[in-house]
């Protein structure tokens, strides 16, 4: 836990104050069919009102996962704060087989002790399935809640939780000297801060695998350039500024390489930079356009978009050589693929019959499932645990962020009120 807080602390260097309207998750589909669970409001052990409603944050996290449906506090048969106070039969009567209880205790030094217990109400009724406590300052209370959520989620699903992750995205605001901003927020839209402001467009943010840096495209010099920015101190390193287009950066999972697309020789082609030496190697060539690289987990293969067959489709190529292999066959065109962290599937933008939606393709069976029904969907990015996808879509006259589970059942949006939001990128585990 202390290590996790140290990693996250690097982000605080860039925090001054939240100067912009934040995005917030609004669930649109899928909660009613999810597993019911009880998340009791955490008992506040101090005077006045608690600085954060920890139980509400944990409940929202579990609801946002699409796998749980926390019942309303008004429907709870009791509101215990410890496992010993839980009456299992009262909960199982409502079809609930697990309950989260907890407390928040203020300390004399100004910090807070957050504790929780996950209680089984059915199998081994009354037994504690998971428990923990964290001592944090006020500004880390939400992070402590997300940590509890991660532990509860993993215990109940066997899948690592991703509630302590963040998302990067580009916002185009209405007017001002610097209308283009690269921002980062918690996965749920809270704690938003600006990484970089620019008078010219910003595009395609991509996280380093340790979460300490973001690569992106900037047009501040009058032409496109690829840069890597360190979040802890704001330092910017330019990595590519060749003639014509420089775009679509993607860090390799092992953190040693950066893939991107350049059109310095005419057509767009894929290149890979060794981040240690700065050496650049060309991966694809020819007259077709090859772009939008996404790494497979082995850090040796790329999925990418190519129009070599006429319309854009997704291909796979080894960065050390060999013929590319076409991956996508369904739909009139497919592009903007993101490979899942385990390499078993990819999500992509699939166009067919005039519609443009996010689809999932199983890389073993080839089966394709359309996940979304929103309008002009773009730039999907998969959560590090592989359960959710964030993407951009058109709503009205603007662009907003949307969420969909990788099984297609849960859907939500993250509306913003101060501009168009595009190019979302989900962070690794932090």
From Swiss-Prot:
UniProt GO cellular component terms: periplasmic space
Compartments, as annotated in UniProt: Periplasm
Pfam families in alphabetical order: PD40, TolB_N
The UniProt record lists the keyword Signal: yes
GO biological process, one term: cell division
Keywords, comma-separated and alphabetical: Cell cycle, Cell division, Periplasm, Signal
Signal peptide (UniProt feature, chain positions): 1-21
InterPro entries: 6-blade_b-propeller_TolB-like, PD40, Tol-Pal_TolB, TolB_N
HAMAP family: TolB
Function: Part of the Tol-Pal system, which plays a role in outer membrane invagination during cell division and is important for maintaining outer membrane integrity. TolB occupies a key intermediary position in the Tol-Pal system because it communicates directly with both membrane-embedded components, Pal in the outer membrane and TolA in the inner membrane.
UniProt subunit comment: The Tol-Pal system is composed of five core proteins: the inner membrane proteins TolA, TolQ and TolR, the periplasmic protein TolB and the outer membrane protein Pal. They form a network linking the inner and outer membranes and the peptidoglycan layer.
NCBIfam families in UniProt: propeller_TolB
Family, per entry: Belongs to the TolB family.
Name of the protein this chain belongs to: Tol-Pal system protein TolB
Source organism of the structure: Yersinia enterocolitica serotype O:8 / biotype 1B (strain NCTC 13174 / 8081)
